[in-house]
Amino acid sequence: HLCDRRQRQMCIRDRHKMIRLVTLSTINGGYLNFMGNEFGHPEWIDFPRQGNGWSYKYAHRQWDLVDRNDLKYQYLGAFDEAMIHIISQKKKFERTPIVKLCENDGDQVLAFLRDDLLFVFNFHPFKSFNGYGILAPTGEYEHILSSDDPAFGGYGLIDMKVKHLTRHDPLFEKDNKESVSYTHLTLPT
């Protein structure tokens, strides 16, 4: 089915964006990127050698792919640029601790805090969540990046203007420490 194929391709692009963001947001000093990976280049690099018959076939990058409007590589390139911009604005980001907030294998949801950024990922291949509770430091959270944003090839299911206030839960209040509360989020697949 063409629809199934398109949906599978969308899922692959979304996973590509999230894996790259998880990698970047957990850096510990450096960020390694391979040529063309920033926009999901479809082929590998293989320089001429005896094992490939001294072929030049894969010894190049198709840099024009990211600029072509008839293809989807532009969305991966735009997401890559946006996520790097956000992280680069944080001074000494790599020195800030990663605080795991949620790791739910059944739901395939991962959430962690780094500096003042809350990262939430839904890796489930077909299950979206509405009102998913994440236990986080009490406060207000706003969207600054979403892999679901149409600018990055997403469906636009997240309203980027919505701010999320945490809801206090006394069961999770810690003695003499910053209180934690639930924030409820929509997590599209």
Where are these regions (language model features)?
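Carbohydrate-binding surface patches
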Residues: 101-136
